[in-house]
Amino acid sequence: MRSRRYKKKGPVRSKKVTYDGITFQSGLEKYMYIALKKAKIKAKYEGQTYELVPSFNYDKSSYERQSNGKGEYKDRGKKKILNIKYTPDFVGSDFIIECKGRANETFPIRWKLFKMYLFHTKSEVTLYKPQNQKECDETVSLILGKRKT
């Protein structure tokens, strides 16, 4: 019996797609846009950016290499640390949708920080994170069902 060889999954390589004059980051986002439009659900594509962690000045020493692991091991502290921002794919009046085929390295922590941000700001939105077309269709059904009640 032949043993199966599995390909190592590389980095996320989604292809940008243009539709209705909007450039989407992936085909799944385009599919979600069409599904929302067909159901007459108003949502803005990448309509709002949230600051999850504000920038700050780090005035202490920090010995490290560059963030890509290259360069000299030296003091890279005493500088401004940039903020962490998050822009969801679709923002509606009572929902936020993030289409994710395959999450990249930073997404899980950013998603948790975003949930924490919504918790602390007492936001009353429902989050949806469809990962395929079937889940996009289910998301639309859930939004429509919630609005009927």
Regions found by a protein language model. Give the residues of each.
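Electrostatic, structured charged patches in enzyme active sites and in nucleic-acid/phosphate-binding
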Residues: M1-T149
